Structures are given as C-alpha cells and as structure tokens.
A protein has these predicted regions:
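Glycine-rich phosphate-binding loop plus the immediately following alpha-helix
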Residues: 164-196, 335-336, 340-356, 361-372
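N-terminal small/polar loop signature for handling phosphorylated ligands or for N-terminal nucleophile
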Residues: 95-158, 261-322
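Gly/Ser/Thr-enriched, mixed-charge loops and adjacent short helices
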Residues: 36-41, 45, 159-296, 301-302
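Phosphate-binding and adjacent anionic-ligand microenvironments
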Residues: 307-309, 322-325, 345, 349-542, ...
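An N-terminal, well-structured beta->alpha segment
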Residues: 2-111, 203, 207-240, 251, ...
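Conserved phosphate/anionic-ligand binding catalytic regions in large, soluble enzymes, centered on
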Residues: 41-61, 151-152, 243, 247-259, ...
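Short Gly/Thr/Asp-enriched flexible loops that form oxyanion-binding sites at enzyme active sites
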Residues: 107-115, 158-165, 256, 318-338, ...
Length: 586
C-alpha cells in the first residue's frame, strides 16, 4: 500500500537535516518547483519482494544514500529479531554485491557501513559483480542475507536494492512485509540503536569492519558452472562456433568471457566499446537484451568476422539474449531451444539426467514448452512472474531441477544458485547453437523443426511507460476498471474466459470454481488479469514490478505459424485499443 506523505513538510525536514551535508543541501536547494518536490517527496520509495527500485535523486521517493541507510537499518532490525541476536550474541554475515551503475558502489558501501555499525559483518565484493555470483556466494560463505545494488536492465536514471535470504533466493512477501514493518518505525536521519540495543550488549557495542572480497567467488562459480555442464555430458571439447559477446557495459565481462573460453569456442569476439563498465550506458541507453538496438555494435562485429550469433547479457548479468545472422530471438524462443535441447540430452543420458525432470516457468512464458514437457515425461511447475518465485520453488527439490525460465530473457540452467543467470545461460546458448550447427541447422531452422513437432505457438509483448504520480494513477485506475468489468472486457476482446489472480476468481467457464482451482493452484495472489479463448488465444495484463509500466502479454496457437501470427495480430489490435481507451479515460 502506498502511503502518501505531506511533500513540502518532508522536504523542509530534509533541508533541516542537511546542514552538515553540503552536497545534499545543494541538491535540495536546487528543487525550486513544487511539482519536482511533490514527485520526490510525496511517498516513500516502495519496498517489496523486489526490494527497492527507482530513479536516483534526492527525496523519499528516490534512490539515494539517505533512503538506503534507512532501509538497511530496517533490515538490521529484521535480522536482530529473526535471529534473536541480543540473547544469542550470534555474529551474522551479510554478502553485498553491486553492478556498474552510477553510484552502485557508493550505495553498496553505505549499506555495508550500516550493517557494520550494528555488529553485522558485511562482506562486499571489491568489484562490481553479477547477480548469480551473489546468490552463489551467499550459499558458499554461509551468509545470513544478501544485498544486490542494481536496477537490472533499466536505463541510467535508475538504481535498486534487492534482498536475498540465506539460500540465495530473493525474499518473498512474508519476509518483505516483516522488513517493511521495521523500516516504517524508523525516521529518516535517525539511525540510533533504539530498539535493538540493550545495556552491555557486546554485539552492538563492538562494531565490525567491512570485509572486501576479491574475485575468488566469481572464479569458483564459473568453474562450478563448467563442471556442472561437464557432469551432464553436454560439454565435449571444442565447439564449432563463432560468437560475438557483449556485456552491454555491465558486469558480465569477466565471468562470461572466462566461461565461454573454457568451453572451447572456435572464435570468440568481444564488442570492445561495451566491455567497459559504464553506468551511463553510452553505447546502449536502454541496456535490455529484449531490444533490437542493443545488438547494433555486436551485429557489426558478427558481419565483419563471419560469426554465427551475438550473445548479450544485461548490466547485472542476470539476463541473456541472442541475435542470429538474421534477427533477434525472443526470450521465449531461447527458452524453447534450451529446454528442447535438455530434453534431447536427457533421452540420450538417462543415467546422468534421468532424475532431472522438472521445468519451472512463469505463467506468461510460452505454452509450447508444456507440449515438449508432456512428450518427454517432464513435470512442470508454473509460478507467478519473477525468479523470486522460481528460485524458492526449485529450492524445495533441487535434485529434480532441469531448467527454469521466463519470457523476459531470464534463465536458470543449474542448481548451484537460486536466481536467473546470464553467465550459465550464455554458455548453454552457445552449446545449443553448436549442437544444431553440427546438424546443419541455424537456430531459426531449429525452431521450425520444434514447432513442426510440437505445435505452432506465437507470443508477443507490449507495454506502456507511465511514469510519475500521474502514471501510477493511470495504471491503478486501468487495472481497477478492467477488474470491475472483467466479463464485459472479455466479451469486447471476443475471448471466452477471464481470470483474476488477485481475487482468484474465474469468469465465463461452465464451472468457474473448478476453472479457478486449476488456474491458480499453488499461486499466491497477484495483481494480474488473464483473458483466454477456447482456441488457444490468451492475453495477460499486469503492472510491472520493476518499472513504471503496464505490461501486456499475447499468446496464440494455430494450425501453422502464419495462423498463430494472424491470431496474435487480431487480439493485439483489439487489446491495445482497449488499453489506449483506458489510459485516455484515466
């Protein structure tokens, strides 16, 4: 729930508390427009299962050191209560990582300083590091918690603060709510010991020092990834493949290059301009592997060097994308190729892979993998959108784990960690591409072969960027209007059934209760609406959890790809007309 604040009152309080901080004071004094002050101070930056994410700047609704200090103090209080530190005297460890964004290192160091002040040992990487290395490191170092300073693939204005539990999983709602309750009790600029300190307590009386970590954990993870694939018998010497790699000015440079070198590529070319850590993302303003434009420099290298594919990872290296000689593959298409390959390997190596029989996928990911799974005796566990759900789900049965993915270019290809990973995904993408190349096929031809065998499915996405106070209200009002008139909109879209993941109700079925039970089994409540037809057409609408955006997902099945395409175009046109009307109305 968003708690509105009296923005001018809060602004003046920050001014009063900035007298000893010339930099903060100068930024506050530059805020002469009340609209600017309102946007920055009308509420607290929301903390949830994805932690914090927002535009960097001064204010309670912005990413800055004041906000981070307060939130970290809330995490401290949460840990003190969870671990009963005052009575047990237990000394906790927190692992902290950060990407190469502007101020990420400073935010990470501030986070470490707060933990150290309260007697919690902060272990912090001395260089920006990938998300997967954090998840792996938490498990290897027996850390009690992890913090990742990142805004993933958002543009340069953004930064974020993600919280991981002691299994290397992103926290879920219960933990997020418990932390938020602690944060809410803390006033800005007031981080004294208050309710955690007791007289004579040797934990808070003796602050600890920050411990800086070198690249050992990263190297160990890369080696373990390669060993994991070797144990699966899917890495067998030199790969007849020429690859261009780009980290999009992010953290992937060291680990991905190292991993790709270890699998023996025939040729590995890097995009020099994008190998440099650059928080301004000068070469790709929106560093998202889902966008064609981020591959422009890589495609030039591909043509110059007659390579097979371009592989890209995003700034915190938790997503991976592919551009072939012809086009960018969608996140779903990459997921299809990897999953199909793993199923083929499983057929050939029952003794090694026989027990690995579970696929994890989000509800917006392609449905063709359901057909592939059925044909290959693979269990499917569907989750809500976000690897926080998949990581927590697979942690319950890691030995059964085969693969996890979501349509937004997020893949988990090993059970060493509990979050999506661009490092191991980049490796497996190259292995899969080489496997098909040995059979005389490109990735596009491979996809056609898979569609011919399992059915013709098509997916597309759309989204509306709606920033600021006004944008947030538009998103809220649009979702409310759709929810309150869900059956009417199902009829407008000419779709038979509708599902509300927040109320867990189904509409339009001959047995709504049974339909709801099947659709929502094992899923928590979420602000998602789905519309579906009996002919295999589906529309899912939701607010993004990480961006000021309304997201729409389309999927269709047809007797051929052209028919599936036609169905997508038809439902997309109808849906976008509805959404545009709602936005205009709001």
């Amino acid at each position: 729930m968003v708690r509105e604040k009296k923005h001018m009152e809060e602004y003046r309080r920050w001014l009063e508390n900035s007298q000893d901080n010339d930099n903060l004071k100068a930024h506050l004094e530059k805020m002469t427009s009340e609209d600017v002050i309102r946007e920055a101070f009308h509420k607290d930056l929301e903390f949830g299962t994805s932690g914090l994410r927002g535009v960097m700047g001064v204010g309670t609704n912005r990413m800055n050191e004041v906000v981070i200090s307060r939130v970290t103090r809330g995490v401290v209080d949460y840990l003190y209560e969870r671990e009963n530190i005052i009575e047990t005297g237990k000394r906790l460890k927190v692992l902290i990582s950060y990407d190469g964004r502007l101020y990420s290192r400073e935010f990470a160091q501030k986070t470490a300083e707060v933990f150290a002040q309260y007697g919690i040992i902060p272990l912090i990487f001395d260089e920006c590091t990938a998300v997967s290395v954090l998840s792996y490191g938490i498990r290897q170092l027996d850390a009690d918690l992890g913090i990742m300073i990142t805004a993933s693939h958002n543009n340069k204005k953004y930064n974020g603060y993600k919280v991981y539990d002691n299994r290397g999983c992103q926290i879920l709602e219960e933990a997020a709510q418990a932390i938020l309750e602690k944060i809410d009790k803390i006033a800005y600029f007031e981080y004294e010991f208050r309710d955690v300190r007791s007289e004579g307590d040797n934990i808070t009386e003796n602050p600890v020092e920050i411990q800086w970590l070198d690249g050992t954990i990263e190297k160990r993870y890369v080696n373990d990834v390669i060993r994991y694939f070797q144990n699966m018998n899917i890495v067998d010497g030199k790969l007849n493949l020429a690859v261009v790699y780009t980290p999009l000015n992010g953290t992937g440079k060291r680990p991905v290059i190292s991993a790709l070198e270890k699998i023996g590529l025939e040729k590995l070319i890097s995009v020099d301009e994008q190998m440099i850590i650059d928080g301004k993302f000068s070469t790709c303003p929106n560093p998202n592997p889902e966008l064609d434009q981020v591959y422009e420099l890589g495609r030039n290298k591909l043509k110059e060097n007659q390579c097979d594919i371009v592989v890209a990872t995003d700034p915190d290296c938790d997503r991976a994308g592919v551009f072939t000689r012809n086009r960018r593959l969608s996140g779903n298409e990459i997921g299809i190729l990897i999953f199909h390959f793993l199923c083929e390997m499983r057929k050939r190596q029952k003794d090694v892979l026989g027990k690995r029989r579970r696929l994890y996928k989000s509800i917006v990911s392609t449905k063709i993998v359901d057909e592939i799974a059925k044909a290959n005796d693979i269990e499917i566990e569907k989750t809500l959108i976000g690897f926080k759900f998949m990581g927590n789900a697979m942690d319950k049965s890691p030995k059964k784990f085969l693969f996890a993915f979501e349509e937004g270019n997020g893949y988990l290809t090993n059970n060493l960690i509990r979050d999506k990973d661009g490092i191991s995904a980049a490796v497996l993408i190259c292995i899969v591409t080489s496997w098909w190349k040995k059979r005389g096929k490109t990735l596009e031809e491979a996809l056609k072969e898979i569609y011919d065998e399992y059915g013709y499915f098509k997916e597309e996405n759309a989204g509306y960027d709606l920033e600021g106070i006004k944008g947030k209200k538009i998103i809220e009002n649009s979702m409310s209007e759709l929810r309150e008139n869900i059956s009417v909109y199902a009829e407008t879209l000419e779709l038979d059934m509708a599902y509300d993941y927040l109320t867990k109700r189904a509409y339009g079925s001959s047995d709504n209760e049974r339909a709801a039970m099947e659709k929502f089994r094992g899923l928590p409540e979420s602000n998602i609406l789905e519309f579906e037809s009996c002919e295999g057409v589906s529309v899912i609408i939701r607010p993004s959890g990480t961006e000021p955006k309304l997201k729409i997902y389309f999927s269709a099945r047809g007797a051929g790809l052209n028919i599936a395409d036609a169905k997508i175009e038809k439902i997309k046109a109808k849906t976008l007309d509805v959404i545009k009307g709602l936005i205009h109305k709001a």
